[in-house]
Amino acid sequence: MKEMGLAYWHPVTYRLIEKILYGRNYRKHYEALSREIGDSSILELCCGDCQVVDYLKGNTYQGLDINPRFVNHAKKKGINVSLQDVMVSEIPEVECIIIHNSLYQFYPHHEKLIYKALQSAQKKLIISEPVINLASSKNRIISFIARWITRVGNNSSAKRFSRKEMEEVFNKFHAERIEFLGRNLMGVISKN
């Protein structure tokens, strides 16, 4: 766990950092995800602190994450989470899959993950990715600190997506809806 950045030391530090970064858009962001999920069964890839669960209304939820601290914390709260690397493990079939605040971690293999998720999503894939990032700051000190805080392992990508880049990804995968949520860009890719 030494190679994990501060954001991933514990779900409490993760949520605190998220609330600081999102500010007044924090709730709006999760409400938009919940609206798009609807009453579908859901699988969250790289589920982190499983915050989206608090915004769901009786959905069947499962999460996958590579961080044992996050997985153990979620399990203690009774949340269905498994310790898995989504790039090497099979992704179970479910109505709705979300990739939330984590696509950058898979760069330059992010499209491979999207294809893999689409194969397992029965109804839709929702991707919500930050496009306003301190890790992309022109101030080298700020960008260094932000990348250090959010690193996942020794091979973490320093890459963060711009709004234009995420729009291109969503267009490539024929997203039916794209919505800006104050910091994130959310795309909904339906299977219908």
Question: Which residues make up each language-model segment?
Answer:
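Conserved class I S-adenosyl-L-methionine
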Residues: 1-36, 40-48
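Class I SAM-dependent methyltransferase SAM/SAH-binding core
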Residues: 48-87
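Short conserved loop adjoining the S-adenosyl-L-methionine
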Residues: 88-92
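A conserved beta-strand element that flanks and buttresses the S-adenosyl-L-methionine
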Residues: 98
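Hydrophobic adenine-recognition pocket in adenosine-nucleotide-binding enzymes
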Residues: 102
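A short, conserved alpha-helix within the catalytic core of class I
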Residues: 106-117
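C-terminal alpha-helical "lid/dimerization" subdomain adjacent to the S-adenosyl-L-methionine
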Residues: 128-170, 177-178
